[in-house]
């Protein structure tokens, strides 16, 4: 963040309560709400202090209450605080690709500072209604299970549910890779209140898979913005807005389709709850901030399609105590167009991506949006898999031979479908030894229709495992023994 200090407008710290600072200004010119304030001083050991905070409340008597974006270690009453005269601004544009930033837009990857000639404020209005693109269109990902059973909306918001070790990171990286290759777009990853280790692992894996191009950093496909778990609540509350601002530039100025990943959207609301309590607001239900819905709405309404481009957002959602009625996830669900649920059961079978075909949903899966053929195919696939699920208890007790011929046929086709929903990923080529596959929606529908019709009953289920389109499964030629 570039700091422009208005030297005439400064105040002094009068109270420090953790990350909350009360600052009294002497002149008549008071900072406005959301203005960035900077503290440049030395601590008791003579080390430099540089802290940025954001005005949250105007208390009267020339006093403001601000929330710090940095740790407040070393601060003391009486220190001078400067009003920068504007809200937080962060660098945007191609110079952000391949780099890691913090909430202030400062690079934290030890590769030197980024170009700050292009900057935008993190607090911006949502696009005007007249600028929105209201046309319903599918955002093709090239991943069979997603495109067929829970398609993403262009400019929509998708909730990604999954525990540790079920392939969430690999799915995120494949989506970043596919949007770059197919749509010519870029991605922005916002790590909100995540573990530092996970953020580091993601960065290293992106470098290994080529999503971040170390040789030519500007040719990378993703920008990373991190506000880790150990950061003050102010930083965790604003890091999502920093990532969103970078994505908005690619949509509005570069006219691109952008993928915005937020991991984890619950941590954004949790940080808001901490800040609200520190500011002395009365809590709402379950201790959350009274402004829960408006904070979420302000973020989500900026994630949309315009006539220039789109931001399609994939948000990891943590469910506290597995309680879907908790105000944080319940507020999030109201904004989602689709849910992608990752299943540990499928991951244990080696079926990747481990997307649960029966639990994942999408508002786009309607015949007047996706077309009659796509809709019928998806419903038939779900019915077959649902029937297979119902029969599994009987199979476990009595065995497959005790089923009727019709049910045995359903089980055989369901097992083929389950395996055909798997797919080799480009970003996992190093681990699987298989070349990655991008499958168009038309090829996906054709393949599942052939399985459902019985035309491929002669092939063994192994022919459908980790393949791209149906021609590849047929060419494998594993006939039943």
Swiss-Prot record:
F-type ATPases have 2 components, CF(1) - the catalytic core - and CF(0) - the membrane proton channel. CF(1) has five subunits: alpha(3), beta(3), gamma(1), delta(1), epsilon(1). CF(0) has four main subunits: a(1), b(1), b'(1) and c(9-12). GO terms for biological process: proton motive force-driven mitochondrial ATP synthesis. InterPro entries: AAA+_ATPase, ATP-synt_VA_C, ATP_synth_F1_bsu, ATPase_a/bsu_AS, ATPase_alpha/beta_chains, ATPase_F1/V1/A1_a/bsu_N, ATPase_F1/V1/A1_a/bsu_N_sf, ATPase_F1/V1/A1_a/bsu_nucl-bd. Coiled coil: none annotated. It catalyses: ATP + H2O + 4 H(+)(in) = ADP + phosphate + 5 H(+)(out). It is found in: Plastid membrane. Its EC number is 7.1.2.2. Keywords: ATP synthesis, ATP-binding, CF(1), Hydrogen ion transport, Ion transport, Membrane, Nucleotide-binding, Plastid, Translocase, Transport. ATP binds at residues 162-169. SUPFAM superfamilies: C-terminal domain of alpha and beta subunits of F1 ATP synthase (SSF47917), N-terminal domain of alpha and beta subunits of F1 ATP synthase (SSF50615), P-loop containing nucleoside triphosphate hydrolases (SSF52540). One of its GO terms (molecular function) is proton-transporting ATP synthase activity, rotational mechanism. It holds the Pfam family ATP-synt_ab_N. It is a peripheral membrane protein. Belongs to the ATPase alpha/beta chains family. Transmembrane segments: none annotated. Produces ATP from ADP in the presence of a proton gradient across the membrane. The catalytic sites are hosted primarily by the beta subunits. This is ATP synthase subunit beta, plastid. GO terms for cellular component: mitochondrion; plastid membrane; proton-transporting ATP synthase complex. The lineage of its organism: Eukaryota, Viridiplantae, Chlorophyta, core chlorophytes, Trebouxiophyceae. It comes from Prototheca wickerhamii. It is an enzyme of class 7 (translocase).
């Amino acid at each position: 963040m570039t700091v422009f200090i208005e030297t005439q407008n400064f105040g002094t710290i009068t109270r420090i309560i953790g990350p909350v600072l009360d600052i009294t200004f002497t002149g008549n010119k008071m900072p406005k709400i959301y203005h960035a304030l900077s503290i440049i001083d030395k601590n008791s050991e003579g080390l430099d202090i540089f802290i940025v905070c954001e005005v949250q409340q105007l208390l009267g008597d020339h006093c403001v209450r601000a929330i710090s974006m940095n740790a407040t270690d070393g601060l003391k009453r009486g220190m001078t605080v400067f009003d920068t005269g504007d809200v937080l601004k962060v660098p945007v544009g191609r110079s952000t690709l391949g780099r890691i930033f913090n909430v202030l837009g400062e690079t934290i990857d030890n590769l030197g500072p980024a170009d700050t000639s292009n900057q935008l404020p993190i607090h911006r209005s949502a696009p005007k209604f007249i600028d929105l693109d209201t046309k319903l269109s599918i955002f093709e990902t090239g991943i069979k299970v997603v495109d067929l059973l829970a398609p993403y909306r262009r400019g929509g918001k998708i909730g990604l549910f999954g525990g540790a070790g079920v392939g969430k990171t690999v799915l995120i990286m494949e989506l970043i890779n596919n949007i770059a290759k197919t749509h010519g777009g870029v991605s922005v990853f916002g790590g909100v209140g995540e573990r530092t280790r996970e953020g580091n692992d993601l960065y290293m894996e992106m470098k290994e898979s080529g999503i971040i191009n170390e040789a030519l950093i500007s040719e990378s496909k993703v920008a990373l913005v991190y506000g880790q778990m150990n950061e003050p609540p102010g930083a965790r509350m604003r890091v999502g807005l920093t990532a969103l601002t970078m994505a908005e530039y690619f949509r509005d100025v570069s006219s691109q389709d952008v993928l915005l990943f937020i991991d984890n959207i619950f941590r954004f609301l949790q940080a808001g709850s901490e800040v609200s309590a520190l500011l002395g607001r009365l809590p709402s239900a379950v201790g959350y901030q009274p402004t829960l819905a408006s904070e979420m709405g302000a973020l989500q309404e900026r994630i949309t399609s315009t006539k220039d481009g789109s931001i399609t957002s994939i948000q990891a959602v943590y469910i506290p105590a597995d309680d879907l009625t908790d105000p944080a996830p319940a507020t999030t669900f109201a904004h989602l167009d689709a849910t992608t649920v990752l299943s540990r059961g499928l991951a244990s079978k080696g079926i990747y991506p481990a997307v649960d075909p029966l639990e994942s949903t999408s508002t786009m899966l309607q015949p007047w949006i996706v077309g009659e053929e796509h809709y019928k195919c998806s419903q038939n696939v779900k019915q077959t898999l649902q029937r297979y699920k119902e029969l599994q208890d009987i199979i476990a007790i009595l065995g497959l031979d005790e089923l009727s011929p019709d049910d045995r046929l359903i089980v055989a086709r369901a097992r083929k479908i389950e395996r055909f929903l798997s797919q080799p990923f480009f970003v996992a080529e190093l681990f699987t030894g298989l070349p990655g596959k991008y499958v168009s929606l038309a090829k996906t529908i054709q393949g599942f229709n052939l399985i459902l019709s019985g035309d491929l009953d002669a092939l063994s289920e192994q022919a459908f495992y980790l393949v791209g389109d149906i021609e590849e499964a047929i060419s494998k030629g594993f006939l039943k023994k």
